[in-house]
Amino acid sequence: LMEDGVLIAPAPYSNPAAYYFPTFKRMSSLEVLKGAPLLRYGPQTTGGVINLISTPIPDEQKGYVEAVTNERGSTDVHATYGDTNGDWGYLFETVQRSAQGFKDIDRSNRNSGFDISDYVGKLRWQGDRQSVTAKLQYSEETSNSTYVGLTDADFNQDPNRRYGLSSPDQMDNTHSGVSLTHQFEWSDNVSSTTTLYRNDFKRNWYKLSGAGNIIDQANAGDANAQGILDGTVDTSGLNYKNNAREYVSQGVQTNFDVNIGNHEFDFGARAHEDEMDRFQPVDVYDQVNGSLVFQNSVAPTGSNNRFETGEALSFWALDKWQATDKLSINLALRYEDVQTSRTQYADPGRTTIDSTRANDSAELLPGASFTYDLTQSWQVLGGVHRGFSPLGGGARANEEPETSKNWEAGVRYFGNAFFAEVIGFYSDFSNKAENCSVGSPCSNGATSGSFITGEAEIAGAEFQLQTGTRAGDFYLPVSLTYTFTQAEISKDNAASGLKKGEQLKDVPENQMSFRTGMEHPSGWDNYLVATYVDEMCVSAGCNNTATKLDETESLFLVDFISRYALTASADVFLKVDNLFDEQQ
């Protein structure tokens, strides 16, 4: 995941499971790269690359305001203003989001919503053959979110209920980013782009630990456990952990674009380092007469008090070769040299080391792909590249990173008002790995580090169709995407305990999205979007277990949006998410 070509995850090498996603409202477009060309980027080079393009500095004085509210009292405001005057251009941007949430917390006056503030400033100097762009970003978020769920009986009675035990749960985070980009045209055929960047992310999710055990007991018929959840039974020793972590991600990257004849070359390098500082004290509460009473705090040691680092040096070389008028060939080569480490401390003052880990890996990642125009309407494509994903700071010295060989082949049709594409894909993993987090535990139950599942195969096909027709004054666009995927262990693994044929986690077999609409020259446009996601394993091997809790249920959602242009510069819209009120 990148923003404007810069790694935006909190710590992509030392802590790849860490989650952060920029405010999407301030993005102007989205780039998705797959196949051999994605080796221009990294570290993950298996499934694809997402590059978020932020709002550009306008060429002239321009402003924009969008204000949205909904039935629950949530508000979203997005505003930008910028200008270019002579050699100088600038942009100011902000997003302000506030929501009350939709869950009701027992015995609490706290809502289950969030507040988000995001600010961006850009300044650019443009010379005859070069430019310098500075970008500053700062955001903060407070979310009254929890991982605590409900018993089956309570969910069936009221899925929007939250137990009072989860009332203190709250996520607080801040993110700041700075980058300086220099672009230079050395000649008509050679240019370079160099970026210095740094991102800081601080978060503390204060939340109840161990609630899942109480819910499991209540599901098994334990009336005392149900009473604890309802607040009618007193209990002691409830642990509320400060899941506090600080991340730093920084580096410098440069890329040269060189055009020679029918070849477009990319040569580049990146020096990157990131870190995670985890310091997680625990507050102990008792529940007395339905209220939480503070008892004491426990200083962090071991896994709650650790420091992880990642250092990486990357090189890449790509050649986009227009071999003939009909044949285009992409050749790519990437090199990743990664060093990670973890240090756990036995005392809060970090004077005594409890344990250490370190891992070094160096991978050469080649790739090649092509497209060939059979006719003006028909095109075939194919490619193969080597995939790579680092394990993170929790990797031991003898553990190998995830690597794979990835093939794709397909055909495209371009018509006057019709586009269709079918692409088959196959990935052969010599060492499939899962990155563990509390939000997405690994198949062995771990909530940090990595879990090696062993050899695996992922195969499937993607289908895409776009067309449209006219009905009087209306234009009716239609688009359909469908993906079929099979993902399973390909060889028994004694270390992980997984067997050949067991399904991988988090990979639905069927996914589909259908979009249609009615567009009118008056500016009144209406769209309907239907999305389907199949059930999928929450831990590897769910196809060989008997419990329904080992996999999700399938989900089908329909959204509707209607937009009307009041003037050339102002419009209004109505959007209904989840039109049929599906909830699972």
For each predicted feature, which ranges?
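C-terminal beta-signal and adjacent terminal beta-strands/loops
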Residues: 430-431, 475, 532-541, 560-584
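Transmembrane beta-barrel wall of Gram-negative outer-membrane proteins
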Residues: 62, 69-98, 107-146, 170-187, ...
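Face-selective signature of the C-terminal outer-membrane beta-barrel domain
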Residues: 126, 131-137, 172-345, 371-373
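Short acidic/polar hinge/loop motifs at secondary-structure boundaries
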Residues: 6-34
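Membrane-embedded beta-barrel scaffold of Gram-negative outer-membrane proteins
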Residues: 181-185, 189-209, 373, 379-383, ...
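Gram-negative outer-membrane beta-barrel transporters
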Residues: 324-325, 329, 426, 449-541
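Structural signature of Gram-negative outer-membrane beta-barrels, strongest in the C-terminal barrel
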Residues: 247, 262-264, 270-274, 303-428, ...
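Transmembrane beta-strands of outer-membrane beta-barrel pores
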Residues: 67-71, 85, 96-100, 127-129, ...
